[in-house]
Swiss-Prot record:
Keywords: Cell membrane, Ion transport, Iron, Membrane, Metal-binding, Transmembrane, Transmembrane helix, Transport, Zinc, Zinc transport. It is a multi-pass membrane protein. HAMAP family: ZupT. Mediates zinc uptake. May also transport other divalent cations. It catalyses: Zn(2+)(in) = Zn(2+)(out). This is Zinc transporter ZupT. The gene is zupT.
Length: 285
């Protein structure tokens, strides 16, 4: 591990994980002040995030994991454990995705207009219902969404943290990529709560708290693993994190990017993300 025992690296890793989590609060602010989503920008940004995650996962993290494991366990065992860990990471995030309630699934990224339209449709369908019942239901939707996103963000926090321990060349682009994809999640939390309560501060608070599961995930992961952190642990974690990020990219970011813009815009964003990640890694050789 490159300076893994260096406390400065650990502090930087926590800071970057915290910044990625805070992006849900940015999404909340956008929901309050933006009446229309720039869908082309959203499309390119999500494609960019996917490009960063896929490139760094397959080119850097997987290879680093394999080197760590092969160096300790030998070629055959090291390669097998690397591959098993990669698909274990995919399985973990897929299970979390499966058991999150479908209607509050954070993978279904929505624009400001979509969330507001859904709420207006809901109110229209329930005109005869009492206002307090409708508001309570909207409040519940926002809270359940916040909890769903918090659960989903937990392994992402560990992913950001582990990548940050490997150095700035990995950490900064991944932090930016995860932050970009956290912004629409903040919108999904804050809009229903704001419509239910009329309180921007409360809506922002719930959005903010849902994002804090990322640094919490990092803290818990580091606390549990710090005493057994070695080349084997590092290799398994890096490979699993690579699997998590590939799944997020293919299951969430790319489909959503294509949904909100032209197919080619998503691909251009994807390629740009890969180029930025490649240059970032080359600069730190």
């Amino acid at each position: 591990m490159k300076g893994g025992d260096n406390m400065n690296n650990v502090l930087m890793a926590f800071l970057l994980t915290l910044l990625a989590g805070l992006a849900t609060g940015i999404g909340s602010c956008i929901a309050f002040f933006a009446k229309k989503t720039n869908k082309k920008f959203l499309c390119v940004s999500l494609g960019f995030s996917a490009g960063v995650m896929i490139y760094v996962s397959m080119i850097e993290m997987f290879q680093t994991a394999k080197e760590s494991l092969v160096g300790v366990m030998g070629i055959k065992a090291g390669n097998w454990i690397t591959v098993i860990s990669f698909f274990a990471g995919i399985a973990i995030i897929a299970l979390i995705d499966k058991f999150v309630p479908e209607e509050e699934n954070p993978h279904e990224v929505r624009s400001v207009e979509e969330v507001e339209n859904e709420i207006e449709e809901y109110k229209g369908e329930n005109k005869e219902g009492k206002a307090d019942i409708k508001d309570k239901t909207l409040m519940r939707t926002g809270i359940v969404t916040a909890l769903a996103i918090a659960i989903h963000n937990f392994p992402e926090g560990l992913a950001t943290f582990v990548s940050a321990l490997e150095g700035a060349s990995l950490a900064i682009p991944i932090t930016i990529a995860i932050a970009i994809h956290n912004i629409p999640e903040g919108i999904s939390v804050s809009v229903p709560i704001f419509y239910a309560t009329g309180d921007k501060k409360k809506a922002f608070l719930y959005s903010f708290l849902s994002g804090m599961s990322e640094p919490i995930g990092a803290i818990i992961g580091y606390t549990l693993l710090r005493n057994i952190f070695n080349d084997i642990t590092l290799g398994i974690l890096l490979s699993a994190v690579a699997g998590i990020m590939v799944f997020i990219s293919l299951d969430e970011l790319l489909p959503t990017a294509r949904k909100y813009g032209e197919h080619h815009l998503a691909i251009y964003g994807l390629i740009a993300g890969m180029v930025v990640m490649a240059v970032s890694l080359l600069l730190f050789i």
